């Protein structure tokens, strides 16, 4: 019986640690950039877009595709940073679990 109680306490402790890690990630700002920093985005760790900055010299009405590509690159850069940090901070909680 004591073993089960010990396991429950350990599970609760891990749950609290995981919650703290999730909050740390959510409160972190991630900055994604395109080539030459012409487009910059900021996301919170919960993947909410906070800002989008586009340098005026990249805005060309004759070539919207370049701007679209730069925005996509900046967004993907930030999202991959979030994914990497999430895996680093939360991956330790799921190692060895059967799912």
UniProtKB/Swiss-Prot annotation:
Record keyword Cytoplasm present: yes
Any one GO cellular component localisation term in the record: bacterial nucleoid
Protein location: Cytoplasm, Nucleoid
Record keyword Nucleotidyltransferase present: no
GO molecular function, one term: DNA binding
InterPro entries: YbaB-like_sf (IPR036894), YbaB/EbfC (IPR004401)
Similarity comment: family membership: Belongs to the YbaB/EbfC family.
Record text on subunit structure and interactions: Homodimer.
NCBIfam families named among the record's database cross-references: DNA_YbaB_EbfC
Name used for this protein in its record: Nucleoid-associated protein LL0120
